[in-house]
UniProtKB/Swiss-Prot annotation:
Domain of life according to the entry: Bacteria
Modified residues (N6-(pyridoxal phosphate)lysine): K182
Single GO MF annotation: pyridoxal phosphate binding
Species of the source: Shigella flexneri
The protein's name: UDP-4-amino-4-deoxy-L-arabinose--oxoglutarate aminotransferase
The EC number(s) this enzyme carries: 2.6.1.87
Assembly behavior: Homodimer.
Lineage, highest ranks first: Bacteria, Pseudomonadati, Pseudomonadota, Gammaproteobacteria, Enterobacterales
């Protein structure tokens, strides 16, 4: 049997090893100069004025919601077809997640669904740039501006994604992920971009105990050695070890995403003759980062269920993923919102399957996946 082909594998090389070695030898391994360099590099990528590195995108979502003073009695609009951390952070702050449906074929939350869910209690909108493609963010921001509601972009899948010529996050507030399967990774990490100076200042406080400065600030700039707590905060800072890896990966971003695009094109060409349905691309001008390549496996159309397909691929030494099981169908949220019905989300949640997609995949690896799909489709 061939070696197991995982759904994802981080693309690490000698450059990342050298970056870690440099930090270890520097004597400063926690938050410091590599964090600052990463934040500056991200501002150059997205065009934002501020970037705040954090220990995870979940941490970034938590403190962004906190900085916007979202809490008990507030509502936050978000798709159900997303990673549960967003719903969890909303709920942990005492607010109510208002889950809305997505477009059946792009899996993007639509401006129409968002606007129809707005109430006097709506405090924020969290659209998801799904699988590496952009949501229609201009239209969504216009809704936010019209109603005076904050828009927080979930850009966990969108490092290297462009919308109408602008990198995701530009002129707004967005949260990126550097988790192990993401387009660039440092194992665990995240980053928030914003043009709102007051928000950026609050985020920096909240990510580090509510202090106005961190240890590197105090040592480097000669600030007061005993910083004051300005507001209760968290320990969500990113170490320089992680930041150095992320910074090295960011330099490689164009190469990494180009390889992802090549594999995606290989899949697209092969799937044209198969019953498995890939996602449709958004109609607006964009550059896809191809974080995920997703097919829909409809048993009536394909002759096999999604779960059976995933198991059959596993038996052939091929890993897959599920992004995502709809949040409102999971125990806690199902019991909290028992009457919620989101037909497009539910249809897709039962059928979506993420195929292997990572930069170190070879053409032969992709061919192996395609051959297995052809066999399982009876071709």
């Amino acid at each position: 049997m061939s070696e197991f082909l995982p759904f994802s594998r981080p693309a690490m090389g000698v450059e990342e090893l050298a970056a870690v070695k440099e930090v270890l030898e520097s004597g400063w391994i926690t938050t410091g100069p590599k964090n600052q360099a990463l934040e500056q590099a991200f501002c150059q990528l997205t065009g934002n004025q501020h970037a705040i590195a954090v220990s995870s995108a979940t941490a970034g979502m938590h403190i962004t919601l906190m900085a916007l003073e979202i809490g008990k009695g507030d509502e936050v609009i978000t798709p159900s077809l997303t990673w549960v951390s967003t719903l969890n952070m909303i709920s942990l702050l005492g607010a109510t997640p208002v889950m809305v449906d997505v477009d059946r074929d792009t899996l993007m939350v639509t401006p129409e669904a968002i606007e129809s869910a707005i109430t006097p209690r709506t405090k924020a909108i969290i659209p998801v740039h799904y699988a590496g493609a952009p949501a229609d963010i201009d239209a969504i921001r216009a809704i936010g501006e019209r109603y005076g509601i904050a828009v927080i972009e979930d850009a966990a899948h969108a490092v290297g994604t462009y919308y109408k010529g602008r990198h995701i996050g530009a002129k707004g507030t967005a949260i990126f992920s550097f988790h192990a399967i993401k387009n660039i990774t440092c194992a665990e990490g995240g980053l928030i971009v914003t043009d709102n100076e007051n928000l950026a200042r609050q985020l920096r406080m909240l990510k580090f105990h509510g202090l106005g400065v961190d240890a590197y600030d105090r040592q480097t700039w000669g600030r007061a050695p005993q910083a004051e707590v300005l507001t209760p905060g968290y320990k969500y800072n990113l170490t320089d070890i992680n930041a150095a890896i992320a910074l090295t990966q960011l330099v490689k971003l164009e190469h990494l995403n180009t390889r992802r695009r090549e594999i995606a094109q290989q899949y697209q060409q092969a799937l044209a003759a198969l019953p498995f349905q890939p996602l449709s691309l958004p109609a607006w001008p964009h550059v896809h980062a191809w974080h995920l390549f997703i097919i829909r496996v409809d048993e009536q159309r394909c002759g096999i269920s999604r779960d059976a397909l995933m198991e059959a691929l596993k038996e052939r030494g091929i890993g897959t993923g599920l992004h995502f099981r709809a949040a409102h169908t999971q125990k806690y949220y199902r019991e909290r919102f028992p009457t919620l019905s989101l037909p497009n989300t539910e249809w897709n949640s039962e059928r979506i399957c993420s195929l292997p997609l990572f930069p170190d995949m070879t053409t032969a690896d992709a061919d192996r996946v395609i051959t297995a799909l052809q066999q399982l489709a009876g071709q």
